[in-house]
Amino acid sequence: MKLSRILSGVVVPALLLAQPLRSPFPFLPALQTPLEPVWWEQLQDSSGNGGWLIPRGGELHARDGTPRRLFGVVLYNTACFPDSTTAIAVAQRLQALGFNAVALVGIDYSNWDASSILQSGTSSSALSPAQMQRLDWFISQLARHNIAVFLALHARWTPRTGDGVPRRDSIPTYGRAVLYTDSAFQQRHRAIVRLLLEHVNPYTGRAYRSDPAIAGVWLTWDNSLLNFWVNNRLHHPGGILSHFHSRQLDTLFAAFLRRKYGSDAALRAAWSVPAADTQNFIPNGSFEDEFSLQWTFSSNSAVAQAVFRLTETNVRHGRFAGLVRIARTNGSPSSVILYNGTQVQQDRLYELRFWARASRPQRPLRLQVYNGEFPYQNLGLYRDTVLGTAWQEFRLRFRAPETAPAARLIFYLGQDTGEVVLDDVRLHMLDESPLQPGESLATVSIARSLYGDLLGATPQRMRDNVEFYTELQQRYYESMSRFLRDSLGYRGIILAGTLLSTFNDLWSMQAMDGIVGSTGWDYRRNRTEPQGSWFIANTPMLGHTAAGNLPGIARASVRDKLSIGLFSMPFPSAHMAEMPLLLSAYGAYQGWDAVFLNYGADSRETYTTPFVRRDKHYELWAHSAVMSLAPSAAIAFRNGLIRLGRDSLPLQQTRAALLRPQWQQGSFWLRFGADNRIMLFRRVFFDSLEASQQSVQPQRQVPELREPDLSRLLSDTEELLWNALDTLFTVTTPRYIAVTGRLKGILQVGPLRVERLDSGWVGTVTWLSLDTAPLPQARRSLLTAVSRACNSDAVWEGSTSIWQGWGTAPMVLEALQLRLSWESTADTILVYGLDSLGRLASGPFSVDRLPGGRVSFRLDQTALPQHTPWFLIEQRWKPTDTTSVAEDGEPPAAWLRVTPHPAGRSGRVEFLLPPTAAAATLLLIDPLGRTQPLWHGRADGALREVALPALAPGLYWLELRSGHYCIRHPVLVSP
């Protein structure tokens, strides 16, 4: 039964999604015309406005002490330098859609003037006045719209010919790796940083270093020396470094060793290991003692039929060999096993030798050295090989990560039927040489070890390599932080980088204000044939049974440090609507301080292009589904509508783990791993990076993971539910409800019942209270409903590519047909459709009364009046009903707005008064103080719109009065 559910949840959607969008309709939140988010703007805080954002106790605060959360987007390259008109439109759009943070990346190119702060020329000694004018204006507009700006200080820069950096022409792309190792490179780059941060923005009147608008900086972007070492990219040839820069790193390594040891003799002594114990650690390895066999045989009778016995026929050594005959198997290697007890010592090098043959060629065999006691981990050897019909000797070396007196050597034999014969099995500890011939500190000839060279480097030699690279990276981050703080006086948030490939990366960043985790789901894969073709997997992250890639952000959480997450998904994935919901929901639950969609745009042209440009898989600026969901996801995250995890699960790391990165397992880099799903049930963070003992299988502290129900991965607040079997995720809080994923049939999400009426598969619905009341009692609420989004005329190849039929404008959404119902005591319920500017555009649509006090609304995006993802739900109570009156502490429900503003030849006034039944008047007051009535009626809670008369240029005032309400609003009429 479970298998069929998994198949229906993963395989079937892929088949269905091969079809074009069903009943698509054009929609995109306006690009250039200012949005008018009057319905939800009162729920947006003022992060980034009026003062520095302050890290305190691992949380972000405004200057008045108010906690802040940032919902941001990353902008790249020329998108960081819009023209003046576009800058205003971009800032306004971001604010209207709920964003209150922006990261600007790729502003430091050396060879692309349109995407650089630097003056064109042969050196990097001056800023470009034209480019800085663009950047200054853009930052001022972002600040004006309460959007915090983060700058990547190094992302693309490499030295120019006149910068005085040796061998600049052989520096890797974007200066990666060399940023940490080349002092001349670092010195020149600091001069650029000084130029930038001492530059005075004429529109704010402040230098960047003292401008709270520049809320934070990244020291580097998508860069990590440790990551390059892990991937064996720091040698020449074969890596990213030239011969010069590889030798430069060799020199630094030799200097590190000289400081630590002083001489070759001391180095040799430190890197040496004791003489090996030469015994065979496999008792009765030749099967000669038939009365004390030592070997244990096991066959799972439910899926296999097999026997083990000694044989005297065609043996390799002595009288006997061990024979396993398998008559039946399901193909699982572990269905038939043969093992022997042994022991291993931590960090020692071993060689396993054995002879084997099989009854048929190409016979698979798996072997492992495994701990027979808790925590039952692999002990350095886990290998698949193939046997032939003739005797063959196998030699396998491994290094033991731990001491294990109850280890086991296991042969896994269940892959195939037939016979397997083993003989002369030996396990020996090996001697090791600390230095290779000719290696010496004096001649700078001590080779740096490859990350994967566990067998060729003694343990202490490898640890010194680890310490060297970690120290280099940490030293760069901390010296740059001191430069920013002490030399430049910068007061904003300082972040190191975005790559966390090892625990060592995290360690190197511990002096920063916060840690950043960057990850994503799915990616573009290029194909060799046909030329230029590509595909994506197009699978839902919600179908992943281990929390997808969200643990890649969760591991960036450290006690008393800010936690920041970046996430990306590729267009045209059908599942991109999962991204804003999952990121904001688990970000709030885990207590992350900022989340960024990565990325919004990477060129100026993107801002005015009403579709996703060809091959721009990660640009979100014109993605209808993601951008339509942004307001509700952002407000829920920023305003704490989703509760912080009730219980925490602090993780412990150790310095010993730091020095053994090859044994850092899983997302949280623990030696014995961790179930990634711990973050779905508890708030997870590193409590200490230098604990006396590392956390061991922390999932044992989560009872729900002892026998996990994959359809009910429920947070301890009971607000977030990840159903991996049905690829469904729900958020259930008093003021915010959301469901995304496999939207089929009937679903109950808190008070909201969602029934899918069409034959579609993917869908997302969010329902957000626009006042302080729970959703069933909310006077106004925002309903957002989206499915797949794609360019017009896109042609799918199966379900994974549109490389030949990318499509063009306009961006379209797949229509949803839903029946929504909830319990309500309101006397009148009206639903309005909002247009791409956020204005009332259609409706009101009535709802049906159901038995038991429930109401029902049919949402049909195939019908023209409902060609929108945004719906405003208005619930009214009779004037005598006290529930319609603003309660103590609740903000007034009355509001007034003029659009457009400044007004031109025409304009209109939109306003609402709470249903008090009091007389109401709207007056226009001209520059001479004369009044003109525009409307008279009663405050009945209705949304109203009144046209402005033709007015001469000047400053006017509107006055809306009703009972104790009085709203005055300026009206500027432009020529």
Where are the language model's segments positioned?
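Active-site mouth of glycoside hydrolases
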Residues: 32, 47-279, 368, 374-375, ...
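C-terminal beta-strand-rich structural cap/linker in extracellular carbohydrate-active enzymes
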Residues: 853-881
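Long, low-hydrophobicity ectodomains and other hydrophilic envelope-associated domains
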Residues: 634-833
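Extracellular and organelle-lumenal recognition/adhesion modules and their flexible linkers in secreted
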Residues: 274-444
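C-terminal outer-membrane/trafficking sorting elements
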Residues: 888-899, 903-975
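Glycoside hydrolase catalytic-domain groove-lining segments
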Residues: 335-337, 438-451, 457-458, 463-467, ...
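A glycine-anchored, Pro-Gly-centered beta-turn/N-cap motif
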Residues: 318, 347-348, 390, 827, ...
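Substrate-binding cleft of secreted/luminal carbohydrate-active enzymes
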Residues: 577-610
